[in-house]
Every structure is written in structure tokens, then in C-alpha cells.
């Protein structure tokens, strides 16, 4: 597994402190420890998602074989060892997929929708709630195909989390499937491409789902708030809005009993993530939703959204900056899926 870590020498790693003797070395050691922890966390996220998605793709059919033969149990052991979980982890993972039952399953199903078409997936789901059993045949349930699929998922997630969703998607194309759908796939290369497609699909859909489901509430006549669980993401969006005051202006607030709103002295990032009791006006919340729409378009690759062509006063590209925020939201969303 190859992970690209973007670090700015001096700032991120504390190298600028090397000339300060013991204090500089202490700073470097602390930064190195922090970087190591970040790499471990990143690897854990990738491993958890790879194991879970491989289980969803192959687990339903294999689960039936676990109690039927020692061969089935052996494949369980091999799959667990392949992803660092051992026999115990594999036995837990190889359960019947809960199609649509949890957040990651929904992202998996959506990735299949994008790949096969919603009608096909719905038809197969109606025939059996075990998607893997309906989509793959017995001859495809080999260790080599599972390893290749897992490697493809791993590579896709490593690219998204290391290089950014936008850059990863720019060089990606969906695999071409014949009339046989997934059952027409044969060989490690085909299953590696399938895993890559599922990994990319899950990453993109995780970001889009997060942006589509930001929860808000109203307290009083014109006091709007982002709910606490979404304020981390709202802060990222607010920082994007702060880069373009000529487009989004400043947030406004209006106390109960006031005839008109006033401009807040807070940045968008702070007003959204750390609001006081006044929150922001409905008009300001609409601007937040406008910004979310721009970021969703960037994540989805929607070149038809002309807002992405706008430029700031200094010439900065709104579309590029929206894509950068989309990358951050994809990473945050994948982390949440892995730890759900």
C-alpha cells in the first residue's frame, strides 16, 4: 500500500526549530510522533474500509459456506489474514451484507448503482437481499479475485485520502461491463478494476452524502444554526466562503425583536462552527447552502455549474478552491464511515 503524505517542510514537521538546540529537537520529535500517528490513523481507516467493502462484495456467498465445509472456513481465514484481521476478524466480517442497513452499506449500494444502473441493482436486491450472491457466481469466489478486489479498493482509498478526491477522480474511468454484468468479470485484473471503481464510488458518494445531509435548526424568529454534529464540516465550508467575500459577503444575525439584521463581526467559519445564541439569519444560511451546492458540483464533476468558473478579487478560482474543500470533506466522511 502506497500512501502519499503532503507535508510542508519546516511548518508541518517542525524542521525550522532545528537550530534551537534541545527545544528544536523536542519540536521535531513531537511533530514526527504526530505524523506517525496520522499515518497510523490513515492506514487504519483504509484497512477497515477495505475489509468491510470486500466483505460486502464477497461475504454473503462465503458466509453460507462457513458452516458447510472446512474449505469455506479456510477461505475465511485467508481473507482475514489478507486484511490483517486473522480468522476471528474474517469470521466477523463475512456475514450477510446488510444492504442499505448502515451508512457504509448505503455508499456501497450507491457505488453499485453508478456502476450497474439503479434498475439492475434494485432487481437483484428484490430477488435476494444478499447482493453478493446475486451479482457474483460461485466460480468467481476465489481467493485471487478477493485479493485483487481488495487491492483495488485499497488503492482507490489510498489515493483519495493521500492525494485528494478531485485528483484521484480526474484519472479514473469506470470499467466497462458486458451484458453479463459483474458475472462476466474474469481474472484478477478485472476484479482489481472493480475494487478500484467501488472504492472511488464510495469516496465520492460519502462526500456528496455528507454535503446533502447537513442538519440545521431554527431557534426563534430568525436565528438559524448548523447542528453540532455537522459543525466540523461547516467550518471547512465557512473557510471557503471567507475566501470569497465578494460572492458571499459577511454573515448576518438578527436578535428577536429587531426590525432588521446586522452584519456579524465573525468570519463565516466561526459563525457556522461556533455560533453564539443569535446564530445567523435565514438569508445567511441560504448563502451557506449556496456554497455547499458549489462544493457538491465540484465533487460530482458537474462542469455545468457556471458558479465554478467565478474568480475572486485576486484571481483565485472558486472551482479549484471548492474542489479542495470537497477533498477535505471526503476524507472526513471516510473517517466517519470507518469508525461508525
From Swiss-Prot:
This is Harpin HrpN. It comes from Dickeya chrysanthemi. Pfam families: Harpin (PF04877). Elicits the hypersensitive response (HR) in the plant upon infection. Harpin elicits HR in non-hosts and is also required for pathogenicity in host plants. The keyword Phosphoprotein does not apply. One of its GO terms (biological process) is symbiont-mediated perturbation of host programmed cell death. It comes from the Bacteria. Residues 262-277 have a biased composition (Basic and acidic residues). Residues 254-283 are annotated as: Disordered. Transmembrane segments: none annotated. It is found in: Secreted. The gene is hrpN.
